[in-house]
Amino acid sequence: MEHLGQVFRFFREARHISLSEATGGEFSKSMLSRFENGQSELSAQKLFSALSAIHTETEEFTVAAGIQDHHSHKELLSQIQDLLQANQLDLLEELYLEKEKITQKSKRASDWVERLIVKAYLCALKESKKASPGELDFLHDYLFSVDIWGRYELNLFSVCTPVLSLDLFSQYTKEILSRKDFATLFANNRNTLHTTFLNGYLLAISQENITQADYFQQVIERHFYEENETYFRIVYLFAQGELICLKGKTEEGLTQMKKAVDIFRILNCQHSADYYQEALDTAFQKYSK
């Protein structure tokens, strides 16, 4: 993609940074010059280093370079929310069929993305709904053909997680963690990634898959929450309690789950407290037999 070098040079010159400074001492300025002139490419690692040296966020660069899709599908998401609030699931199914029909004639990625978004909501609402092999293949190819992820790709992954089986969710998480741009991705999108890892943890626990639950717990522990990320800490405390129950220590697990609910009540987070109290009641009936 020859234009990437041109976009990089635009940011570098706009900030009055020399070629030597822009390399960050990581590679030669002649290599950077060839990249800017479209004569060669830079590895992802060198590009991240150079972007840091010219004080440019990865997402700022990807938007300017046209790598990141500006189409955020806000109109579609708003339409879906309206249907959900009106409890018109039949119309949501019709919307999916409409999107499916469009993709039978169109190869545009944005059309397939919209089809997947609607399918994801259907899967979340109805266990009987499953993504087709073609939809799953498209999602994987679309996400992992992008060299540099930004908020768009992460949000798309987050929205589409209901179409994934636990094994696929785990596979995608491993691929995200192995990306060269993961450190930057995590720094710029902590909430989204915290939510993703926690959802994987909760999914594994709900399916009573201790091996996968232990994996997601390790991921969470390696990228643990700051003190100002209290909500994540409380939900994680609750989920840990259920995993303890699943491993046979019912009294200890239920006590920990109750502790999380009590914290929500102390903080006057009544909606969250009521939601997790209901989950605690269900767990009590399940594990106290």
Annotate the PLM regions:
Residues Q85-E98, S128-D137, L166-S178, Q207-Q218, ...:
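Helix-turn-helix repeat elements of alpha-solenoid scaffolds
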Residues E153-T230:
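Alpha-helical adaptor scaffolds
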Residues Y96-Q104, F138-F144, L177-T184, Q217-E226, ...:
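Amphipathic alpha-helical segments of tetratricopeptide repeats
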Residues V63-D90, D262:
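Short, charged recognition helix plus adjacent turn
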Residues H16-S33:
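Short alpha-helical DNA-recognition segment
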Residues Q45-E60:
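DNA major-groove recognition helix of helix-turn-helix/homeodomain DNA-binding modules
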Residues M1-A14:
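A short, Lys/Arg-rich alpha-helix, primarily the initiator
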Residues V7, K46, S78, E114-L125, ...:
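"A position-specific structural signal for the A-helix of alpha-solenoid helical repeats
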